[in-house]
């Protein structure tokens, strides 16, 4: 009889231990999880521009309009591509279906100032935008401003300036995605 009680006690102890471990697996520490969409989510995505017919302004530091080398960087297609890639990195699948929840990126300001200061060339990018998420009849939005200054010893080239623009957008979107806007919008 004593052996039977010992055996069932052992099973009970082991059983509790297994349940305890399973509960730990079911409820992990939420503070250590990344703030990303946990499953692929289909969205409609668009970049809009309220800066008339051009995406932004390019000026040198003296104030004169200048900078043909930046024009490729400032194309709406390039912006759409960079932002779409960032959204994909966060687990979104982009679709043209208008019935899906939508993410809209509205550019409210984009300017690049370039010029020579002392012995180095300076590129200043100033980007301001509003990100809107529309889902189930509600609209959540967040506005951000970002300035990125880069100094080089050689005159800037198209590829280098496109990298500055892409990095700026990427950093800015990371800031936005670290807020709860997207998580709340798609719950």
Residue positions per predicted region:
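A structural "domain/chain start" motif
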Residues: 16-77, 182-187
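Sec-exported extracytoplasmic/periplasmic mature domains
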Residues: 84-92, 173, 177-182
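Surface-exposed short loop/turn segments
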Residues: 17-28, 90-141, 145-156
């Amino acid at each position: 009889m004593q052996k039977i009680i010992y055996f069932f006690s052992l099973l009970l102890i082991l059983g509790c231990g297994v349940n305890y471990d399973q509960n730990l697996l079911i409820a992990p520490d939420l503070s250590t999880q990344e703030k990303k969409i946990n499953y692929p989510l289909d969205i409609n995505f668009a970049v809009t521009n309220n800066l008339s017919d051009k995406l932004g302004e390019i000026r040198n530091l003296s104030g004169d309009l200048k900078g043909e080398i930046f024009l490729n960087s400032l194309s709406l297609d390039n912006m759409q591509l960079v932002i779409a890639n960032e959204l994909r990195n966060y687990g979104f699948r982009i679709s043209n279906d208008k019935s899906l929840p939508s993410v809209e990126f509205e550019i409210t300001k984009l300017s690049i100032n370039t010029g020579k200061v002392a012995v180095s060339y300076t590129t200043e990018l100033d980007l301001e935008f509003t990100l809107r998420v529309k889902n189930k009849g509600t609209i959540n939005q967040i506005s951000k401003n970002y300035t990125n200054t880069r100094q080089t010893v050689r005159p800037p080239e198209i590829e280098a300036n496109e990298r500055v623009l892409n990095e700026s957008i990427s950093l800015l979107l990371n800031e936005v995605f670290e807020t709860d806007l997207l998580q709340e919008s798609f719950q």
